[in-house]
Amino acid sequence: FWRVISDGSDVIGEEFDLAVAYIEGASAYYVHDHVKSKKKVGFIHIDYSKAGYTRKTDKNCYDDFDRIFTVSDEVKECFISVYPELEEKTKVFHNIIDEEKIISKSSEKMKYKMSDKGIRLLTVGRLTYQKGYDVAVYALKELVNHGFDVNWYILGDGPEYQTLAALAVKEGIDSRFHLLGAVDNPYPYYKAADIYVHATRFEGKSIAIQEAQVLGCAIIASDCSGNREQINDGVDGILCGFTPAGIADGIEKLITNPALATKFRMASAEKQINHLEELQNIYGMMR
Protein backbone atom coordinates (compact mmCIF):
# COMPACT_ATOMS: atom_id res chain seq x y z
CA PHE A 1 0.00 0.00 0.00
CA TRP A 2 2.74 2.47 0.96
CA ARG A 3 4.69 1.71 -2.19
CA VAL A 4 1.62 2.58 -4.25
CA ILE A 5 0.78 5.88 -2.56
CA SER A 6 4.43 6.99 -2.34
CA ASP A 7 4.93 6.76 -6.10
CA GLY A 8 3.62 10.30 -6.46
CA SER A 9 5.82 11.80 -3.73
CA ASP A 10 8.57 14.25 -4.54
CA VAL A 11 12.22 13.35 -4.14
CA ILE A 12 13.87 15.27 -1.30
CA GLY A 13 16.15 17.86 -2.90
CA GLU A 14 18.99 17.75 -0.38
CA GLU A 15 21.63 15.02 -0.58
CA PHE A 16 22.64 13.31 2.68
CA ASP A 17 25.78 11.43 3.70
CA LEU A 18 23.78 8.49 5.07
CA ALA A 19 20.08 7.59 4.82
CA VAL A 20 18.72 4.95 7.20
CA ALA A 21 15.48 3.03 6.64
CA TYR A 22 14.79 2.10 10.25
CA ILE A 23 12.32 -0.68 9.38
CA GLU A 24 11.23 -2.82 6.45
CA GLY A 25 8.33 -1.78 4.24
CA ALA A 26 7.29 1.88 4.15
CA SER A 27 10.54 3.25 5.55
CA ALA A 28 12.69 1.25 3.10
CA TYR A 29 10.50 2.16 0.14
CA TYR A 30 10.62 5.86 0.99
CA VAL A 31 14.40 5.92 1.42
CA HIS A 32 14.86 4.09 -1.87
CA ASP A 33 12.38 6.12 -3.89
CA HIS A 34 12.64 9.64 -2.46
CA VAL A 35 15.93 10.18 -0.60
CA LYS A 36 19.25 11.09 -2.24
CA SER A 37 22.29 10.02 -0.21
CA LYS A 38 25.86 8.83 -0.64
CA LYS A 39 25.04 5.64 1.28
CA LYS A 40 21.82 3.87 2.22
CA VAL A 41 21.20 1.41 5.05
CA GLY A 42 18.09 -0.67 5.69
CA PHE A 43 17.02 -2.50 8.87
CA ILE A 44 14.97 -5.71 8.89
CA HIS A 45 13.16 -6.48 12.15
CA ILE A 46 10.91 -9.40 11.25
CA ASP A 47 10.67 -12.84 9.66
CA TYR A 48 10.49 -11.38 6.16
CA SER A 49 8.42 -13.97 4.32
CA LYS A 50 5.93 -14.53 7.17
CA ALA A 51 5.35 -10.78 7.40
CA GLY A 52 4.02 -10.85 3.83
CA TYR A 53 6.81 -9.04 1.97
CA THR A 54 7.77 -10.27 -1.50
CA ARG A 55 10.17 -9.28 -4.25
CA LYS A 56 7.17 -8.10 -6.23
CA THR A 57 6.00 -5.65 -3.55
CA ASP A 58 9.56 -4.49 -2.84
CA LYS A 59 10.32 -3.86 -6.52
CA ASN A 60 13.92 -4.79 -5.67
CA CYS A 61 14.39 -1.64 -3.58
CA TYR A 62 17.14 -3.32 -1.54
CA ASP A 63 19.44 -3.56 -4.56
CA ASP A 64 20.17 0.13 -4.02
CA PHE A 65 21.15 -0.24 -0.35
CA ASP A 66 24.82 -0.35 0.63
CA ARG A 67 24.17 -2.37 3.78
CA ILE A 68 21.21 -4.29 5.18
CA PHE A 69 21.12 -4.98 8.91
CA THR A 70 18.90 -7.65 10.44
CA VAL A 71 18.17 -7.75 14.17
CA SER A 72 19.01 -11.45 14.61
CA ASP A 73 20.66 -14.40 12.89
CA GLU A 74 17.31 -16.06 12.15
CA VAL A 75 15.91 -12.85 10.69
CA LYS A 76 18.98 -12.71 8.46
CA GLU A 77 18.39 -16.28 7.27
CA CYS A 78 14.75 -15.49 6.48
CA PHE A 79 15.68 -12.34 4.56
CA ILE A 80 18.42 -14.13 2.59
CA SER A 81 15.94 -16.86 1.64
CA VAL A 82 14.03 -14.12 -0.23
CA TYR A 83 17.13 -12.23 -1.43
CA PRO A 84 20.00 -14.74 -1.70
CA GLU A 85 21.98 -12.40 -3.96
CA LEU A 86 22.18 -9.82 -1.14
CA GLU A 87 23.87 -12.10 1.39
CA GLU A 88 27.26 -10.37 1.19
CA LYS A 89 25.92 -6.98 2.22
CA THR A 90 23.52 -8.29 4.89
CA LYS A 91 24.82 -8.25 8.48
CA VAL A 92 23.33 -8.78 11.94
CA PHE A 93 22.79 -5.65 14.07
CA HIS A 94 21.32 -6.39 17.50
CA ASN A 95 18.84 -3.97 19.08
CA ILE A 96 20.42 -1.29 21.26
CA ILE A 97 18.69 -0.44 24.54
CA ASP A 98 19.60 1.84 27.44
CA GLU A 99 19.86 -0.51 30.44
CA GLU A 100 20.58 2.22 33.00
CA LYS A 101 17.54 4.24 31.91
CA ILE A 102 15.30 1.16 32.03
CA ILE A 103 16.39 0.28 35.56
CA SER A 104 16.04 3.87 36.76
CA LYS A 105 12.55 4.38 35.28
CA SER A 106 11.33 1.04 36.67
CA SER A 107 11.12 2.66 40.12
CA GLU A 108 8.66 5.34 39.00
CA LYS A 109 4.94 5.20 39.75
CA MET A 110 2.65 3.16 37.49
CA LYS A 111 -0.15 4.95 35.64
CA TYR A 112 -2.50 1.98 36.21
CA LYS A 113 -2.53 -0.10 39.38
CA MET A 114 -1.90 -3.83 39.14
CA SER A 115 -3.72 -6.24 41.44
CA ASP A 116 -2.10 -7.04 44.79
CA LYS A 117 -3.66 -10.51 44.71
CA GLY A 118 -2.84 -13.58 42.65
CA ILE A 119 -0.36 -13.87 39.80
CA ARG A 120 0.41 -10.86 37.61
CA LEU A 121 1.22 -11.65 33.98
CA LEU A 122 2.51 -8.96 31.62
CA THR A 123 2.86 -8.64 27.85
CA VAL A 124 4.11 -5.51 26.05
CA GLY A 125 3.55 -4.94 22.34
CA ARG A 126 1.22 -3.59 19.70
CA LEU A 127 -2.22 -5.16 19.42
CA THR A 128 -1.74 -6.91 16.09
CA TYR A 129 -2.42 -10.39 14.75
CA GLN A 130 1.31 -11.19 14.77
CA LYS A 131 1.48 -10.72 18.55
CA GLY A 132 -1.03 -13.49 19.22
CA TYR A 133 -3.17 -11.89 21.90
CA ASP A 134 -6.20 -13.85 20.72
CA VAL A 135 -4.42 -17.05 21.76
CA ALA A 136 -3.49 -15.38 25.07
CA VAL A 137 -7.21 -14.92 25.84
CA TYR A 138 -7.80 -18.67 25.52
CA ALA A 139 -4.64 -19.45 27.51
CA LEU A 140 -5.86 -17.21 30.32
CA LYS A 141 -9.23 -18.95 30.28
CA GLU A 142 -7.47 -22.31 30.68
CA LEU A 143 -5.53 -21.00 33.67
CA VAL A 144 -8.71 -19.71 35.32
CA ASN A 145 -10.49 -23.01 34.63
CA HIS A 146 -7.57 -24.79 36.32
CA GLY A 147 -8.20 -22.74 39.45
CA PHE A 148 -5.39 -20.17 39.22
CA ASP A 149 -5.93 -16.60 40.41
CA VAL A 150 -4.33 -14.77 37.48
CA ASN A 151 -4.52 -11.29 35.97
CA TRP A 152 -2.98 -10.61 32.56
CA TYR A 153 -1.94 -7.03 31.77
CA ILE A 154 -1.35 -5.90 28.17
CA LEU A 155 0.52 -2.67 27.37
CA GLY A 156 0.12 -1.43 23.81
CA ASP A 157 -2.31 -0.01 21.27
CA GLY A 158 -3.25 -1.32 17.87
CA PRO A 159 -5.96 -2.37 15.43
CA GLU A 160 -6.96 -5.52 17.36
CA TYR A 161 -8.15 -3.66 20.48
CA GLN A 162 -11.91 -3.95 19.93
CA THR A 163 -11.67 -7.54 18.70
CA LEU A 164 -9.64 -8.61 21.74
CA ALA A 165 -11.87 -6.76 24.20
CA ALA A 166 -14.93 -8.47 22.70
CA LEU A 167 -13.23 -11.88 22.76
CA ALA A 168 -12.34 -11.48 26.45
CA VAL A 169 -15.98 -10.67 27.23
CA LYS A 170 -17.19 -13.63 25.15
CA GLU A 171 -14.86 -16.02 27.00
CA GLY A 172 -15.84 -14.60 30.39
CA ILE A 173 -12.38 -13.42 31.46
CA ASP A 174 -12.64 -9.68 30.75
CA SER A 175 -12.19 -8.89 34.47
CA ARG A 176 -8.77 -10.56 34.31
CA PHE A 177 -7.58 -9.57 30.81
CA HIS A 178 -6.54 -5.93 31.11
CA LEU A 179 -5.96 -3.96 27.90
CA LEU A 180 -4.26 -0.88 29.34
CA GLY A 181 -3.19 0.75 26.07
CA ALA A 182 0.18 2.38 25.48
CA VAL A 183 1.96 4.00 28.43
CA ASP A 184 4.92 6.37 28.44
CA ASN A 185 6.81 4.26 30.97
CA PRO A 186 6.23 0.48 30.85
CA TYR A 187 9.17 -0.41 33.09
CA PRO A 188 7.43 -0.34 36.52
CA TYR A 189 5.01 -2.95 35.12
CA TYR A 190 7.88 -5.29 34.21
CA LYS A 191 9.24 -4.85 37.72
CA ALA A 192 5.87 -5.62 39.34
CA ALA A 193 4.98 -8.59 37.11
CA ASP A 194 5.40 -12.14 38.36
CA ILE A 195 5.85 -13.50 34.82
CA TYR A 196 6.51 -11.82 31.48
CA VAL A 197 4.80 -13.61 28.56
CA HIS A 198 5.81 -13.05 24.93
CA ALA A 199 3.80 -15.57 22.92
CA THR A 200 3.84 -14.37 19.31
CA ARG A 201 3.10 -16.02 15.98
CA PHE A 202 6.46 -14.89 14.62
CA GLU A 203 9.10 -12.44 15.74
CA GLY A 204 12.24 -10.64 14.67
CA LYS A 205 14.05 -9.85 17.87
CA SER A 206 11.91 -8.46 20.64
CA ILE A 207 12.97 -5.31 22.45
CA ALA A 208 10.28 -6.14 25.02
CA ILE A 209 12.07 -9.40 25.88
CA GLN A 210 15.36 -7.50 26.21
CA GLU A 211 13.71 -5.01 28.56
CA ALA A 212 12.20 -7.84 30.61
CA GLN A 213 15.63 -9.45 30.91
CA VAL A 214 17.25 -6.20 32.05
CA LEU A 215 14.65 -6.01 34.83
CA GLY A 216 15.12 -9.66 35.84
CA CYS A 217 11.74 -11.06 34.80
CA ALA A 218 10.80 -14.72 34.64
CA ILE A 219 9.98 -15.08 30.93
CA ILE A 220 7.84 -17.38 28.81
CA ALA A 221 7.99 -16.98 25.02
CA SER A 222 6.64 -18.89 22.06
CA ASP A 223 9.10 -21.15 20.26
CA CYS A 224 9.57 -19.11 17.08
CA SER A 225 12.32 -17.29 15.20
CA GLY A 226 13.74 -14.38 17.17
CA ASN A 227 12.51 -15.66 20.52
CA ARG A 228 14.81 -18.67 20.21
CA GLU A 229 17.82 -16.36 20.03
CA GLN A 230 16.81 -14.53 23.20
CA ILE A 231 15.59 -17.35 25.43
CA ASN A 232 17.65 -20.41 26.33
CA ASP A 233 14.85 -22.86 27.08
CA GLY A 234 15.04 -24.15 30.64
CA VAL A 235 18.03 -21.93 31.48
CA ASP A 236 16.71 -18.36 31.52
CA GLY A 237 13.09 -18.90 30.49
CA ILE A 238 10.60 -21.22 28.83
CA LEU A 239 9.96 -21.62 25.11
CA CYS A 240 6.40 -22.87 24.72
CA GLY A 241 4.18 -24.06 21.91
CA PHE A 242 2.00 -21.37 20.36
CA THR A 243 -1.32 -22.82 21.50
CA PRO A 244 -3.56 -21.97 24.46
CA ALA A 245 -2.50 -25.21 26.15
CA GLY A 246 1.20 -24.65 25.42
CA ILE A 247 1.17 -21.13 26.83
CA ALA A 248 -0.95 -22.08 29.84
CA ASP A 249 1.29 -25.07 30.63
CA GLY A 250 4.39 -22.86 30.61
CA ILE A 251 2.77 -20.35 32.94
CA GLU A 252 1.58 -23.14 35.25
CA LYS A 253 5.15 -24.46 35.52
CA LEU A 254 6.34 -21.15 36.91
CA ILE A 255 3.33 -20.62 39.17
CA THR A 256 3.69 -24.06 40.76
CA ASN A 257 7.50 -24.01 40.89
CA PRO A 258 8.64 -20.74 42.51
CA ALA A 259 12.25 -21.96 42.61
CA LEU A 260 12.26 -22.29 38.82
CA ALA A 261 10.82 -18.79 38.45
CA THR A 262 13.54 -17.44 40.75
CA LYS A 263 16.20 -19.25 38.72
CA PHE A 264 14.94 -17.61 35.51
CA ARG A 265 14.82 -14.16 37.12
CA MET A 266 18.42 -14.43 38.24
CA ALA A 267 19.55 -15.72 34.83
CA SER A 268 17.73 -12.89 33.04
CA ALA A 269 19.28 -10.22 35.24
CA GLU A 270 22.77 -11.66 34.70
CA LYS A 271 22.61 -11.46 30.90
CA GLN A 272 25.30 -9.16 29.54
CA ILE A 273 24.56 -6.83 26.63
CA ASN A 274 27.41 -5.35 24.61
CA HIS A 275 26.55 -2.78 21.95
CA LEU A 276 30.11 -2.00 20.82
CA GLU A 277 29.96 -4.08 17.64
CA GLU A 278 26.63 -2.54 16.62
CA LEU A 279 27.93 1.00 17.11
CA GLN A 280 31.04 0.19 15.10
CA ASN A 281 28.82 -1.05 12.26
CA ILE A 282 27.04 2.30 12.05
CA TYR A 283 30.21 4.35 12.44
CA GLY A 284 31.79 2.30 9.66
CA MET A 285 29.00 3.29 7.27
CA MET A 286 29.80 6.97 7.80
CA ARG A 287 33.46 6.75 6.80
Q: Could you tell me what each predicted segment is?
A:
Residues 182, 201:
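Aromatic "clamp/platform" in nucleotide-sugar-dependent glycosyltransferases that forms part
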Residues 211, 223-234, 238-239:
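Short acidic/histidine- and often glycine-rich active-site loop of Leloir-type glycosyltransferases
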Residues 119-142, 148, 159-165:
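A conserved mid-protein helix/loop that constitutes part of the nucleotide-sugar donor-binding site
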Residues 218-221:
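Short hydrophobic beta-strand element within catalytic cores of glycosyltransferases
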Residues 272-287:
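C-terminal alpha-helical cap of glycosyltransferases
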Residues 246, 260-274:
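A short, well-ordered alpha-helix in the C-terminal region of glycosyltransferases
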Residues 233-234, 238-245, 253-258:
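Conserved acidic donor-binding segment of nucleotide-sugar-dependent glycosyltransferases
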Residues 74, 96:
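Carbohydrate-associated surface elements
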